[in-house]
Design a protein with these regions (language model features):
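Short acidic (Asp/Glu) and glycine-rich catalytic loops that position anionic groups and cofactors
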Residues: 42, 56-60, 235-240
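Short, conserved catalytic or interaction motifs in soluble domains
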Residues: 48
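Short helix-to-coil "ATP-lid" hinge immediately C-terminal to the conserved N-box Asn in the Bergerat
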Residues: 23
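Short alpha-helical DNA-recognition segment
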Residues: 26-45
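C-terminal regulatory/effector modules of DNA-binding transcriptional regulators
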Residues: 168, 175, 185-288
């Protein structure tokens, strides 16, 4: 497993395994931290995947405390720990990313299915480079970003898109609102290029895009969210705020977002209608 997965996935998986072992012993995360001489929050942060567990001795002490004696069981955890310490793909970008985004990006790389709803801007994996540039440039002053930070942000976004065309890439299903696509980012020329990029990507076998028309009387979530599903790990949900990315893994939370997504997907015109909707929208907006 460790050889096929990214370090973020392995870190989160290791945390999940350690949490389950701790819960079987009836101990709290704080109690284990204090007993083993860790900082008060260390165990809970390791279990959530927020931080790695770089010291082999720390993992061995946890395994001993949780009565993990079988050599094979110990090797599974040791393998996860070793793999989780390899270089993070987005480590060099960490200083320009909002809080929580490095964890999300690391997990996105290993997702087998991605479902996203975006009511404000085009979902990052679908963005044309000119659209991404215009969006980031428009926020440059407000967010106090340097030109270098903008360029690096664009590079991240374009690198993420490459997974869509890689062998074994994820299944991607995106729901956008017409209002998102009517909101001009950059210029009409940028928007036309973005429309064409959505059409191009939606022609891929693993990508579906739906658009909720403005005049369709149906439910719309007020905030964006993305559901990531994995092979060998429970799904997670991500949502953005101004300065941070928040993630949920509780089954009831994930279920709630799944119901929202499924309801909107059922109501919106099917993916086959997306090229026509974009063509009609372009004609209405710019009379072409």
């Amino acid at each position: 497993v460790a050889g096929r997965r990214g370090p973020t996935f392995l870190r989160v998986t290791l945390g999940k395994e350690l949490r389950e072992l701790r819960e079987r012993t009836g101990l709290t995360a704080e109690a284990v931290s204090l007993e083993l001489g860790f900082s008060r929050s260390k165990v809970s942060r390791v279990e959530s995947g927020d931080i790695p567990l770089p010291k082999l001795a720390d993992l061995e002490r946890l395994m001993d405390r949780y009565n993990v004696t079988d050599p094979d069981d110990r090797e599974v955890l040791l393998s996860l720990q070793r793999g989780s310490l390899s270089k993070e793909p987005y480590l060099s970008y960490r200083n320009i990313l909002p809080s929580g985004m490095p964890l999300y990006l690391g997990l996105e790389r290993d997702a087998v299915r991605i479902r996203s709803y975006e009511p404000g801007v085009v979902f990052g994996l679908l963005q044309d480079e000119s659209y991404a540039r215009a969006q980031m440039e428009s926020a440059k002053v407000v967010e106090e970003r340097t030109t270098d930070a903008v360029e690096r942000g664009i590079r991240i976004r374009m690198e993420r898109k490459e997974r869509l065309i890689e062998p074994g890439g994820p299944e991607v299903h995106v729901i956008l609102t017409e209002n998102t696509l009517r909101t001009v980012i950059g210029s009409p020329a940028v928007m036309r290029a973005q429309y064409r990029e959505i059409v191009r990507l939606s022609s891929l076998d693993n990508v579906e895009v739906q658009i909720i028309p403005d005049d369709l009387p149906t439910y719309r979530s007020s905030w964006n969210f993305t559901i990531l599903e994995f092979d060998g790990l429970s799904p997670v949900v991500q949502s953005d705020s101004y300065k941070a990315t928040t993630m949920w893994s509780k089954a009831s939370d994930v279920g709630q977002y799944r119901r929202q997504f499924d309801d909107m997907a059922k109501a919106a015109p099917g993916p086959a209608q997306t090229p026509r909707i974009l063509h009609d929208l372009e004609k209405r907006l710019w009379n072409e």
